[in-house]
């Protein structure tokens, strides 16, 4: 039996593309396992999918001087030893890495054991983890064509983002039934990512009096960010996090307000949902979400509102502009060349072990 180990973590965006590929490999006689951190969100998502999971020590390397770098280097070194032990025992034919700091010791360990590594980069510019990991990998995939310049030309293919099959198979009627929403009123989906988005949550809730006059709102606000005072509010449903309901909510959505994580926005592109992207600011990130958003705006798939300019007034204005021009955005997405990367990547993995 062919064997593969996946790695990736830190946020759902580093995990769900792996799950999309795993779903396909499950039908192709593969033995599958996953290496992630002890307590990261990846553990919850992977174990829920019924995949064997190995936790290792993980640390974050920062782009600035910090004493935590010293202790985190020790954690990464320990993670390398743990990953190497797991790989020696499991003897996978190939490792697939999706990014996040937990992946660095895993792909380094695979390199020392001469196990081929396939690596996918979702963002327009690679994160630090993938910049470190690329020296240990053999095959590279990117979501954006521009990203390929950061990896070896002969070993890199632009494939788009791996999208879970089930996300494309939801039911609009079921989504509206779950929320008890009307079929006649437009539905606005708000997603701040698996960890939530405080500023977006605040702006949405400050705008409810205005927005709910036009829209019914599905607000996925992140763990610990529910507002009990808003339970039972007309045309408004809030959720910390959703899993089984998500495909149905996506089909029910006429518009989406979202962060600029690559995997999420490629999912909305595949579903042809007009987007208002509010990327993480440069003060909170390396600016990758801003670049992702700018590319989608340039291609006509989305509008963008920088977090520094986010108020209830600017949010309401941008949502209305998006709704007014929704058909233009849908037509641009219909004409896009974006494809689901899952089929291509699974074929390459099959070829790797032949």
UniProtKB/Swiss-Prot annotation:
SUPFAM superfamilies: UDP-Glycosyltransferase/glycogen phosphorylase (SSF53756)
Primary location: membrane
Pathway where this protein functions: Cell wall biogenesis; peptidoglycan biosynthesis
Coiled coil: none
Assigned protein family: Belongs to the glycosyltransferase 28 family. MurG subfamily.
Protein's job: Cell wall formation. Catalyzes the transfer of a GlcNAc subunit on undecaprenyl-pyrophosphoryl-MurNAc-pentapeptide (lipid intermediate I) to form undecaprenyl-pyrophosphoryl-MurNAc-(pentapeptide)GlcNAc (lipid intermediate II).
Protein name: UDP-N-acetylglucosamine--N-acetylmuramyl-(pentapeptide) pyrophosphoryl-undecaprenol N-acetylglucosamine transferase
Record organism: Shouchella clausii (strain KSM-K16) (Alkalihalobacillus clausii)
């Amino acid at each position: 039996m062919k064997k593969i180990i996946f790695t990736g973590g830190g946020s759902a965006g580093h995990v769900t593309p792996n799950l999309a590929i795993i779903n396909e490999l499950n039908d192709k006689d593969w033995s599958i396992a996953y290496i992630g951190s002890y307590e990261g969100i990846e553990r919850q998502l992977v174990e829920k999918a019924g995949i064997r999971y190995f936790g290792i020590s993980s640390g974050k390397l920062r782009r600035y001087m910090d004493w935590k770098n010293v202790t985190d280097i020790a954690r990464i070194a320990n993670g390398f030893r743990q990953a190497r032990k797991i790989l020696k025992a499991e003897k996978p034919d190939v490792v697939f890495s999706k990014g996040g700091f937990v992946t660095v010791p895993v792909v380094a360990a695979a390199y020392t054991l001469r196990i081929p590594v396939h690596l996918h980069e979702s963002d327009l510019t690679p994160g630090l983890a993938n910049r470190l990991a690329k020296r240990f990998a053999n095959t590279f995939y990117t979501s954006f064509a521009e990203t390929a310049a950061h990896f070896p030309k002969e070993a890199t293919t632009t494939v788009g983002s791996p999208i879970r099959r089930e996300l494309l198979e939801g039911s609009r009627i079921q989504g509206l039934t779950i929320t008890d929403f009307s079929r006649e009123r437009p539905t606005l989906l708000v997603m701040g990512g698996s960890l939530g988005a405080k500023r977006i949550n605040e702006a949405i809730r400050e705008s409810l009096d205005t927005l709910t006059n036009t829209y019914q709102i599905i607000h996925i606000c992140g763990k610990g960010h529910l507002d009990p005072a808003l339970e039972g509010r007309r045309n408004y449903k809030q959720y910390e996090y959703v899993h089984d309901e998500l495909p149905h909510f996506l089909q029910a959505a006429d518009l989406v307000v979202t962060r600029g994580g690559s995997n999420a926005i490629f999912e909305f592109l595949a579903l042809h949902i007009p987007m208002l992207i509010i990327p993480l600011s440069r003060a909170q990130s390396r600016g990758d979400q801003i670049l992702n958003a700018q590319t989608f705006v340039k291609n006509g798939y989305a509008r963008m509102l920088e977090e520094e300019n986010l108020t209830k007034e600017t949010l309401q204005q941008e949502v209305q502009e998006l709704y007014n021009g929704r058909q233009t955005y849908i037509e641009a997405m219909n004409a896009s060349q974006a494809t689901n990367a899952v089929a291509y990547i699974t074929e390459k993995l099959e070829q790797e072990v032949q």
